[in-house]
C-alpha cells in the first residue's frame, strides 16, 4: 500500500503542517508541506471518486515536488523561500506564458496552494457546522470561494454536481480517525490555524514575487 493509499489521519496532517513552519513562521519546509498534502490526498481518496478531479492532479504535483527534493539541487528546494529565490534567479519559471518550465517548482506548488485554500475553507466549515449541516453545501461554498476561480466552466459544473454525493457530517468525522465528534472538532480547531498560517505565508511570498498568476 503506497503512502497516499493509507488510511487518513487528521493528526498526521496536523503534525506535518505544524512542522512546516520555521524561523518564527517566516518560512515553510517543503518536505513537510508535501507530507501534509499526502495526508490530504488520503482524505480525498477515502471519499471515493468525488474529489478525484483535485486528488489526481495533487498526486502528480506531489510527485514533481518529491523529484525536486530528491534531485541534485534538493537543498535549493528545502524551503519555500529558497525554492523561489533559486528558480527565479536561474530563470526556471515561465512568468508570462508556458514554455520550457511548465513543471517548475513554483508553478507546481502554486497549484497545490490553490487547492489547499479550498480544503482549508471546507474543513473549517465542517468544524463550525452542526449535525444538520449539508456537507455538499459547505463544500460548494468553499469551492466557489477558491478553486472555482481557476477552473473552466465545465470543470466547475462537474465539481458541484459531484459534491451532491458527499456523505453526512458524521461520516466525514469518522473518516478523520480521531474519535468522537467533540474530539474531531477539537483536533480541527488545533489543526486549521497551522494550515492557515502555511497558506497565508505562501500567499504572501508568491504575491511579493508576482507569482500568483503563473500560466
From Swiss-Prot:
Any single GO BP term: ceramide transport
Alphabetized UniProt keyword annotations: Cell membrane, Cytoplasm, Endosome, Golgi apparatus, Lipid transport, Lipid-binding, Membrane, Nucleus, Transport
GO molecular function, one term: phospholipid binding
Membrane topology: Peripheral membrane protein
Catalysis: reaction(s): N-(hexadecanoyl)-sphing-4-enine-1-phosphate(in) = N-(hexadecanoyl)-sphing-4-enine-1-phosphate(out); N-(9Z-octadecenoyl)-sphing-4-enine-1-phosphate(in) = N-(9Z-octadecenoyl)-sphing-4-enine-1-phosphate(out)
InterPro entries the record matches: GLTP_sf, Glycolipid_transfer_prot_dom
Annotated disulfide bonds: none
Subcellular locations according to the entry: Cytoplasm, Cytosol; Golgi apparatus, trans-Golgi network membrane; Cell membrane; Endosome membrane
GO-annotated cellular components: cytosol; endosome membrane; Golgi apparatus; nuclear outer membrane; plasma membrane
Gene3D superfamilies noted in UniProt: Glycolipid transfer protein
Ligand binding (an N-acylsphingoid base 1-phosphate): 57, 61, 107, 111, 151
Pfam families reported in the protein's UniProt record: GLTP (PF08718)
Function: Mediates the intracellular transfer of ceramide-1-phosphate (C1P) between organelle membranes and the cell membrane. Required for normal structure of the Golgi stacks. Can bind phosphoceramides with a variety of aliphatic chains, but has a preference for lipids with saturated C16:0 or monounsaturated C18:1 aliphatic chains, and is inefficient with phosphoceramides containing lignoceryl (C24:0). Plays a role in the regulation of the cellular levels of ceramide-1-phosphate, and thereby contributes to the regulation of phospholipase PLA2G4A activity and the release of arachidonic acid.
Entry similarity comment: Belongs to the GLTP family.
UniProt name for this protein: Ceramide-1-phosphate transfer protein
